[in-house]
Design a protein with these regions (language model features):
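Juxtamembrane loop-to-helix connectors within ABC transporter transmembrane domains
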Residues: 2, 11, 99-100, 117-163
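An intracellular "coupling" helix at the cytosolic face of ABC transporter transmembrane type-1 domains
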Residues: 13, 123-124, 140-149, 153, ...
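Hydrophobic alpha-helical transmembrane bundles that constitute the permease/transmembrane domains
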Residues: 26-34, 82-93, 145-148, 152-164, ...
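Short intracellular "coupling" helices and adjacent cytoplasmic loop segments at the cytosolic face
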Residues: 47-51, 104, 111-136, 140-142, ...
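Helix-loop-helix
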Residues: 169-186, 190-192, 253-326, 331-332
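ABC-type nucleotide-binding domain
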Residues: 347-596
């Protein structure tokens, strides 16, 4: 019941349209249930000459009582069948259109809600979530919900209504025949319910396997350069084939379960019809029922079989939608990041103080990434951070951008505690340039203007010149209107990094962080960019993470991180004068440069 409530909650706001579509559906089913009565009257009254039986249909037919004999009578009855079919067709047309409008509105709301919620989830969630899995939940799972709202729930109500109404009409004809027909129905229904309960776990597995395939495709296409460079295409093919076979085998298992269920259901249906024909013929032979009654009863029995069997299939399909709803709710139940937790939006000048900061990632609480880290930067200064891989360099600047929250200690910007400042505001004041920048599959100009869409083309070109990218862009056939491809695949690593630098400089943030974002450019370009940045810098505070000594040697202060702790701190001249990691790296790089 909880799953059904969850599914129906997606229809909120469109309940009137769904109710109208349901009314159209139920009237349509009433017309379907009346057709065997027309057959009964045709056989007994029009052909057999008996008096019209009691009932609503008989009152309608009585309007044509002067034309119910011979050929004219058959024409009247045939015309009524056609008229009923036309009315049912109009009701079906109305139901489909109304249900379509209601469903598309509901699904648009759900899709937007899901996408918006994903946007608001914290960086810690996205760092461990599988992209392919998220994509499937926004597409395949939402589509499964759409089918449930559009037809499956309404078909369930329609089938239950038709079953109840048909049993009522059968009881009006003959109670004993109705009981024979009804006695098998619970067995059919409960077998459907048991089957649905067992098949639901199989649907869940199939959905997970499909998500695994989607993830494999997404990872392969995203990393196609690596696949080509390391000739890993055969490995990727084999990996996908294994996942595809696993998905296929799971679907075959589901199909085999369905085949067994439908074979059992068919046997019950045949037994039900056979019992009605056998006992009904005996009653007709004894003149306890008419030939028209028997034919109508057989029609009702077949009419009863279909919704009962269909109910099993619908319930099974709703089982899929329950799985999809649970997968969607898993995301919606994730606590979103509160981007604007306070109204604190102080003017940022760039005075930064880290005081005894400790930090661990949520999934590795026992492993400290940063341990009692303290340092300070004055407005307009440049701080450089050096350290081996995994020492906590990127984690440190992620804390400053509030992508993660620190466990203990204090970070203050211009005297304000960082965690009291609006996340949205602090991120607008901190420009973060990553080592592997993400570019959208748009033009170069659109990617540069991403941070400030309304900025002029001339300003965008100016910052491209600062990043020493303008000359290279102008060599492209379409210049700044060149499409960079998905994730910037048409650009080199250095070009992507420089585009990201230009994009961040446009923000005019008082604090700019370079997270090893000059690693893909040559030394001379590195020097040229840093020289241009000095002229452009003004009073901005800069934090530069790099493994290259030449990139950070001009910084006002340099800290060396090892195992999450500051092992050294000082200027370039001070650090090369003392034993430690900084001097060792400096000596190695100097020796390599001398040999070059």
């Amino acid at each position: 019941m909880q799953n059904l409530k969850k599914l129906l909650s997606y229809a909120r706001g469109q309940s009137r349209l769904y109710l109208l579509a349901l009314i159209f559906t139920l009237f349509s089913q009433v017309i379907v249930a009346m057709q065997p009565q027309l057959i009964r009257i045709t056989i007994d009254s029009v052909i057999g000459g008996a008096a019209l039986p009691k009932g609503l249909i008989s009152r309608l037919v009585a309007l044509f009582k002067n034309h119910l004999t011979g050929t004219s009578g058959l024409i009247v009855m045939a015309s009524l069948v056609v008229a009923f079919s036309l009315v049912r067709g109009l009701l079906t047309f109305g139901r489909i259109n109304i249900a379509s409008i209601a469903t598309e509105r509901s699904i648009k709301t759900l899709r937007n809600r899901l996408y918006n919620h994903i946007q608001l989830l914290p960086y810690s969630y996205h760092s461990k979530a599988e992209t392919g899995n998220l994509i499937q939940r926004c597409t395949s799972d939402v589509e499964t919900i759409r089918l449930a709202l559009y037809s499956q729930i309404m078909d369930t109500i329609s089938a239950v209504f038709l079953i109840i109404y048909t049993i009522y009409l059968m009881a009006q004809l003959n109670t004993s025949l109705m009981l024979i027909s009804f006695c098998i129905m619970p067995l059919t229904f409960f077998s459907s319910a048991i089957f649905f309960k067992r098949i639901q776990s199989q649907f869940k597995k199939a959905t997970e396997y499909e998500a695994s395939m989607t993830t494999a495709i997404q990872e392969n296409l995203t990393g196609i350069r690596v696949v080509k460079a390391f000739t890993r295409h055969q490995y990727e093919i084999e990996k996908f084939i294994k996942r595809s076979e696993r998905y296929r085998n799971q679907n075959l298992k589901i199909n085999n379960s369905f085949a067994a269920f439908w074979a059992f259901a068919d046997s019950l249906s045949i037994a039900q019809v056979f019992g009605i024909i056998l006992y009904g013929s005996l009653l007709a032979y004894r003149n306890e029922i008419t030939a028209g009654d028997l034919v109508a009863f057989i029609s009702y029995t077949e009419m009863l079989i279909w919704p009962v069997r269909r109910l099993g299939r619908i319930i099974s399909n709703i089982g899929k939608s329950f799985v999809s709803a649970n997968r969607i709710e898993t995301i919606l139940n994730e606590t979103p990041e509160d981007i604007f937790p306070t109204n604190e939006k102080p003017e940022i000048t760039g005075n930064i103080v880290f005081d005894s900061i400790s930090f661990s990632y949520p999934e590795t609480q026992n492993q400290k990434i940063l341990d009692n880290v303290s340092f300070s930067i004055k407005s307009g200064q440049t701080l450089a951070i050096l350290g081996p891989t995994g020492s906590g360099k990127s984690s440190l600047v992620h804390l400053l951008a509030r992508l993660y929250e620190y466990d203990s200690g204090s970070i203050k910007i211009d005297g304000k505690e960082l965690n009291t400042i609006d996340k949205g505001w602090i991120r607008s004041q901190v420009g973060l340039i990553l080592q592997e920048p993400f570019l959208y599959g748009r033009t170069i100009m659109e990617n540069i203007k991403l941070a400030v869409p309304g900025i002029s083309d001339s300003s965008a070109r100016h910052f491209s010149k600062v990043a020493f990218l303008d000359d290279e862009i102008n060599k492209f056939e379409k210049g700044y209107e060149t499409l960079v491809g998905e994730r910037g695949v048409s650009l080199s690593g250095g070009q992507k990094q420089r585009l990201a630098i230009a994009r961040t400089l446009i923000k005019d943030s008082p604090v700019i962080i370079f997270d090893d974002s000059l690693s893909a450019v040559d030394t001379q370009t590195d020097i040229s960019i840093r020289s241009a940045l000095k002229e452009e810098k003004g009073n901005k505070t800069m934090i530069i993470i790099s493994h290259r000594i030449s990139t950070i040697c001009d910084a006002d202060n340099i800290i060396v991180l090892e195992n999450g702790k500051i092992s050294q701190e000082g200027t370039h001249e001070e650090l090369i004068a003392q034993e430690g990691l900084y001097k060792r790296i400096y000596d190695i790089q100097s020796a390599v440069q001398a040999r070059a």
